């Protein structure tokens, strides 16, 4: 018996057709199950009490009287956090009159940048340090931090004392541990009205979520 050669692409075309057919059948089955079970699809899950973080040291700006909160658990030394800060800045510019925006430190351990922001907060300069560090093109080292503190005309003796305060370190370390206990695992983590946002960090999707909450 002689073998009959198949034309090139015949098997690939058949497999492709079978895959498309399988996908259609599966999608039809899923749609049918959704309709019968009346399942609702969420972009993020219903409220989870364990993800409430407002009792921790959260810094706020925007509309402080708003019932809609947008909290970010973030790390100054995290590349993804630095990138997300650009999106967050756009959201803040768009919704600052309607939303209460919050920030809470979250990392493996308290960083120099985080400690500096908390020390600056003692003199009312948390957000200026926060923005400057995220906008800095390199890792914020002690030289950058002290030079920026001087440029803001802080009391340098007081700033230095608070920067190296054991209580300052313990406070941030405790916050990090509490966040881990509440289920946070990565940075940046977004929390809108006590709900974790798992799926997206895009400006468009986050805008839609905020519009739904307002």
What are these regions (language model features)?
Residues 1, 22, 40, 136-145:
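Short, mixed-charge aromatic SLiMs
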Residues 1-9, 29:
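FKBP-type peptidyl-prolyl cis-trans isomerase
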Residues 8-12, 16-24, 68, 79-82, ...:
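Soluble non-cytosolic domains of exported or imported proteins
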Residues 10, 20, 147-214:
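C-terminal cap of thioredoxin/glutaredoxin-like
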Residues 11-14, 43-50, 128-136:
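Short N-terminal helix-initiation segments at or just after the protein's N-terminus
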Residues 18-109, 164, 168-180, 186:
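Extracytoplasmic thiol/disulfide redox context detector
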Residues 71-150, 155, 160, 182:
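Structural alpha/beta surface segment adjacent to cysteine/selenocysteine redox centers
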